A protein has these predicted regions:
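Juxtamembrane/disordered regions of integral membrane proteins
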Residues: 1-113
């Protein structure tokens, strides 16, 4: 899902210092990206799109809505799990990242439908 990866890159690098600050406060060390895990996430997102969004969408608008809902669920699972287990994971970051994920997967679904 190259489209989602491109959209996410804007989010990640557009606020790199904010992301670094959040994750360094949680892991108590400099931010390190595991590229294999990142690629696997986008592979799972592509599987979700082709199995749950594309077959059940009649047009781009429906694909956007279903993609946004899928993104909300995927990113909320990540962010709320982090909030539940890491005391330094901030609510404002969890909310912003979840909303971003909803928008990003919605836009990616709209674009590639």
């Amino acid at each position: 899902m190259i489209v989602l990866m491109a959209i996410d890159t804007i989010w990640l690098y557009g606020n790199l210092e904010g992301h670094k600050k959040q994750f360094e406060s949680v892991q108590k060390s400099p931010l390190q990206i595991d590229k294999v895990a990142g690629i696997l996430f986008y592979l799972v997102a592509a599987i979700a799109f082709f199995n749950f969004i594309k077959p059940y969408s009649k047009n781009k608008e429906e694909a956007f809505k279903k993609g946004a809902l899928m993104g909300l669920c995927m990113y909320a699972t990540f962010d709320l799990t982090n909030k539940a287990i890491f005391t330094d994971y901030k609510w404002d970051y969890a909310i912003k990242d979840t909303l971003w994920g909803s928008f990003a997967l919605g836009l990616a679904s709209y674009t590639i439908f």
